[in-house]
Swiss-Prot record:
<dbReference type="InterPro" id="IPR029510">
    <property type="entry name" value="Ald_DH_CS_GLU"/>
</dbReference>
<dbReference type="GO" id="GO:0004029">
    <property type="term" value="F:aldehyde dehydrogenase (NAD+) activity"/>
</dbReference>
<dbReference type="InterPro" id="IPR016162">
    <property type="entry name" value="Ald_DH_N"/>
</dbReference>
<keyword id="KW-0520">NAD</keyword>
<feature type="site" description="Transition state stabilizer">
    <location>
        <position position="188"/>
    </location>
</feature>
<keyword id="KW-0496">Mitochondrion</keyword>
<dbReference type="Pfam" id="PF00171">
    <property type="entry name" value="Aldedh"/>
</dbReference>
<dbReference type="InterPro" id="IPR015590">
    <property type="entry name" value="Aldehyde_DH_dom"/>
</dbReference>
<feature type="modified residue" description="N6-acetyllysine; alternate">
    <location>
        <position position="385"/>
    </location>
</feature>
<feature type="transit peptide" description="Mitochondrion">
    <location>
        <begin position="1"/>
        <end position="19"/>
    </location>
</feature>
<protein>
    <recommendedName>
        <fullName>Aldehyde dehydrogenase X, mitochondrial</fullName>
        <ecNumber>1.2.1.3</ecNumber>
    </recommendedName>
</protein>
<feature type="modified residue" description="N6-succinyllysine; alternate">
    <location>
        <position position="401"/>
    </location>
</feature>
<keyword id="KW-0809">Transit peptide</keyword>
<feature type="modified residue" description="N6-succinyllysine; alternate">
    <location>
        <position position="366"/>
    </location>
</feature>
<feature type="active site" description="Nucleophile">
    <location>
        <position position="321"/>
    </location>
</feature>
<dbReference type="InterPro" id="IPR016163">
    <property type="entry name" value="Ald_DH_C"/>
</dbReference>
<feature type="modified residue" description="N6-succinyllysine; alternate">
    <location>
        <position position="385"/>
    </location>
</feature>
Length: 519
């Protein structure tokens, strides 16, 4: 049932994105209390309790109340899942003998099922994660559907080539699947991150053991049921719920896992890289933290820059690895920009994420909530000027008022460390070379943005900024068509786009002796 009061254009403008929805389309009503249908481990296309029989609670961040309990997988369960994935990857198995085009058909079928259950999945995501329903439905689910369809199209187009070589030989290359892929996904975009990991792995013929975030397991488990319904053979996809130090570590350390892909904090990324090296030198893809700069030059469109820098930070409650968490503004426009930024932050609607006009929901859990408030206190202690927000919103749940700091110095911890919350620090700069040096003076390098009307300056910044993605006069434009990943301690490897397929295949060279070679 559609609610015609709340139209899509505001949300599309929020991210500068276009979706398959007409701007005249109304949002459907959410399901405020979606039924929890799955809470067990998904191994070999079957549902299982944890070997230990342990469970853990998943909490509604809007209220702080327990939604339900989910199986707590650990090393023993990971072993079972890896065994199932290895059997599914066995030479001559149904999955290995399946045509690449058929793998693409299965991924398209999965996209169809996600589209069919879009309202339910978006509602489940909002319940477990706390993000506004309109963002779950319009942005996240749109990206999920597109990533499965996009990678489905690549399934029979990612291939080797013939190579002319000297002598009486014929040579060609094969792009072969890596094998059993361990995947560990975060809680900030559960379904999106699941799609980013699963789609390229399956398109290229791998099998998967995925550990989902303990804060947000529900939507990933429901999607597991759709994987079975779509027709993927047993063992191709296995979903484990559990904690990072147990289930996640077991995947990273496992001697029969050929590759691990992780999205999360830089600190955990270091541990996973080390575990991979200490075990079987499994291939590693890491998409980690960020402290991304948004740079506003004096010639920028002021209204547009204020809007974009606001959403660059506050989108998804600030819980975004590529959030624009350092806003540098040229000195001549700094005070006007600051005033407009504070005004916009004060107007941001915080509240129940199931209400269709809500712009900001709660932080994902109590730990994250308290960590962010701690950084706000630290910023004040270090001498930054608190201009708005800085405290909890409401009496229950994990809500924080949109917070803006001025007078922030580069050596402050709120300027150097990833806060991962609705806290926007503003900085002043005078010269282009100065701001480039300051923007790059971080251990991170995930993303950056520049706002200017001068094309020469925009191109210069795009070359000078040390980041995997540079946006010009926009922010947070991430789609399945383009590679995404970081420089420095923001990770290694790329996800999405054609480049993202490389991480899931090995290139094999086959050379054949021939009796006579002709051109």
């Amino acid at each position: 049932m559609l609610n015609a009061r709340f139209l899509v254009p505001r949300l599309l403008c929020l991210q500068g994105r276009t979706t398959s929805y007409s701007t005249a389309a109304a949002l459907p009503n959410p399901i405020p209390n979606p039924e929890i249908r799955y809470n067990q481990l998904f191994i070999n296309n079957e549902w299982h309790d944890a070997v230990s029989k342990k469970t853990f609670p998943t909490v509604n961040p809007t209220t702080g109340e327990v939604i339900g309990h989910v199986a707590e997988g650990d090393r023993a369960d990971v072993d079972l899942a890896v065994r199932a994935a290895r059997e599914a990857f066995r030479l001559g198995s149904p999955w290995r003998r399946m045509d690449a085009s058929e793998r693409g058909r299965l991924l398209n079928r999965l996209a169809d099922l996600v589209e069919r259950d879009r309202v339910y999945l978006a509602s489940l995501e909002t319940l477990d994660n706390g993000k506004p329903f309109q963002e779950s439905y319009v942005l996240d689910l749109d990206e999920v559907i597109k990533v499965y369809r996009y990678l489905a199209g690549w399934a029979d187009k990612w291939h080797g080539k013939t190579i002319p070589m000297d002598g009486e030989h014929f040579c060609f290359t094969r792009h072969e699947p890596v094998g059993v892929c361990g995947q560990i996904i975060p809680w900030n975009f559960p379904l999106v991150m699941q799609g980013w990991k699963l789609a390229p792995a399956l398109a290229t013929g791998n099998t998967v053991v995925m550990k989902v975030a303990e804060q947000t397991p529900l939507s990933a488990l429901y999607l597991a049921s759709l994987i079975k319904e779509a027709g993927f053979p047993p063992g191709v996809v296995n979903i484990i719920t559990g904690y990072g130090p147990t289930a996640g570590a077991a995947i990273a350390q496992h001697m029969d896992v050929d590759k691990v892909a992780f999205t999360g904090s830089t600190e955990v990324g270091h541990l996973i890289q080390k575990a991979a090296g200490d075990s079987n030198l499994k291939r590693v893809t890491l998409e980690l933290g960020g402290k991304s700069p948004s740079i506003v030059l004096a010639d920028a469109d002021m209204d547009h820059a204020v809007d974009q820098c606001h959403e660059a930070l506050f989108f998804n409650m600030g819980q975004c690895c590529c959030a624009g968490s350092r806003t540098f503004v040229e000195e001549s426009i700094y005070h006007e920009f600051l005033e407009r930024t504070v005004e916009k932050a004060k107007k941001r609607k915080v509240g129940n994420p199931f209400e269709l006009d809500t712009q900001q929901g709660p932080q994902v859990d109590k730990e994250q909530f308290e960590k962010i408030l701690g950084y706000i206190r630290l910023g004040q202690k270090e001498g930054a000027k608190l201009l708005c927000g800085g405290e909890r919103f409401g009496e229950r749940g994990f809500f924080i008022k949109p917070t803006v700091f001025g007078n922030v110095q580069d050596d402050m911890r709120i300027a150097r460390e990833e806060i991962f919350g609705p806290v926007q620090p503003l900085f002043k700069f005078k010269k282009i070379e100065e701001v480039i040096q300051r923007a790059n003076n971080t251990r991170y390098g995930l993303a950056a943005a520049v706002f200017t009307r001068d094309l020469d300056k925009a191109l210069y910044f795009s070359q000078a900024l040390q980041a995997g993605t540079v946006w010009v006069n926009t922010y947070n434009i991430v789609t399945c068509h383009t590679p995404f990943g970081g420089f420095k301690e923001s990770g290694n490897g790329r996800e999405l786009g054609e480049d993202g397929l490389k991480a899931y295949t090995e290139v094999k060279t086959v050379t054949i002796k021939v009796s006579e070679k002709n051109s």
